[in-house]
């Protein structure tokens, strides 16, 4: 069979050129709008609908959507709990640079959920997330150093990580740091600092902080109380409040 060499009319060529154009690519704005729509559905408890929005984005390489899909599987929201699938999605997101996913990969390695327990990898990913500013990762690094879990035990380094996190408004870290200042673990004993951090933690429902705060107050002089209350007022005026999206829980100590 011979191949026709007949020229295509100009009008037909224009039609061919038009239909051959690629579809318009989704912009970052499109992705952001879809992610936000998914978040709103998630907050309303419409997990399955959120998954329908996030999954295509995740499969297309969006690391934030990948983290959300991982969270759905980790927590069993709209799907059956599956730590293995959660780990796979978190890993994709973590490798793409998402700090929360990096923290969750570290937590899964530490607890042996969805992957074989490996404290070397747990510390590696947790440290990366902590350095990228994730509060749960910073808290967990403090726990690792306080317990000597996967790292050489160091109360000094534990206090340093608790402080990084506490200064960004992480309430449990504020409570831990306040305790360390009260008893002098990893830091020099300081009732004013203890009062500051225990007060900030206590006002957000950390019961153990309130109990210990009473002990601190009972040992303080009038001048110490005055200085401590002024310091608390300064910190409250800053409005530091770290309320990150729902992710895997911090590792219990």
Locate the predicted segments by residue.
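Short helix-capping/linker turns of helical repeat alpha-solenoids
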Residues: 29-30, 42-45, 59-63, 75-77, ...
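Terminal, low-structured helical/coil segments at or just beyond the last alpha-helical repeat
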Residues: 2-23, 208-253
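Hydrophobic face of amphipathic alpha-helices that form TPR/SEL1-like repeat modules
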Residues: 34-36, 40-41, 53-57, 68-75, ...
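TPR-adjacent "capping" and linker segments in tetratricopeptide-repeat scaffold/adaptor proteins
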Residues: 20-33
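Alpha-solenoid helical repeat scaffolds
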Residues: 67-68, 103-104, 119, 139-140, ...
């Amino acid at each position: 069979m011979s191949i026709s060499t007949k020229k295509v009319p100009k009008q037909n060529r224009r039609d061919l050129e038009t239909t051959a154009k690629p579809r318009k690519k989704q912009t970052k704005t499109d992705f952001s709008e879809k992610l936000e729509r998914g978040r709103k559905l998630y907050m309303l408890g419409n997990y399955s609908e959120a998954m329908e929005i996030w999954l295509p984005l995740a499969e297309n390489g969006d690391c934030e959507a990948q983290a959300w899909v991982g969270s759905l599987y980790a927590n069993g929201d709209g799907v059956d709990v599956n730590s293995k699938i959660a780990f796979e999605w978190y890993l994709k997101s973590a490798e793409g640079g998402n700090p929360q996913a990096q923290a969750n990969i570290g937590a899964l390695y530490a607890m042996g959920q969805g992957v074989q327990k490996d404290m070397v990898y747990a510390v590696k990913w947790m440290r990366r997330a902590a350095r990228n500013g994730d509060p749960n990762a910073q808290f967990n690094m403090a726990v690792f150093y306080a317990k000597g879990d996967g790292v050489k035990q160091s109360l000094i380094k534990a206090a340093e990580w608790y402080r990084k996190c506490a200064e960004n408004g992480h309430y449990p870290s504020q409570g831990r740091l306040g305790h360390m200042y009260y008893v002098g673990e990893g830091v020099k004993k300081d009732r004013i600092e203890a009062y500051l951090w225990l007060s900030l933690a206590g006002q957000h429902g950390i019961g153990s902080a309130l109990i210990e705060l009473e002990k601190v107050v009972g040992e303080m002089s009038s001048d110490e109380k005055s200085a401590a209350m002024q310091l608390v007022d300064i910190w409250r005026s800053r409005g530091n409040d770290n309320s990150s999206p729902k992710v895997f829980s911090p590792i219990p100590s």
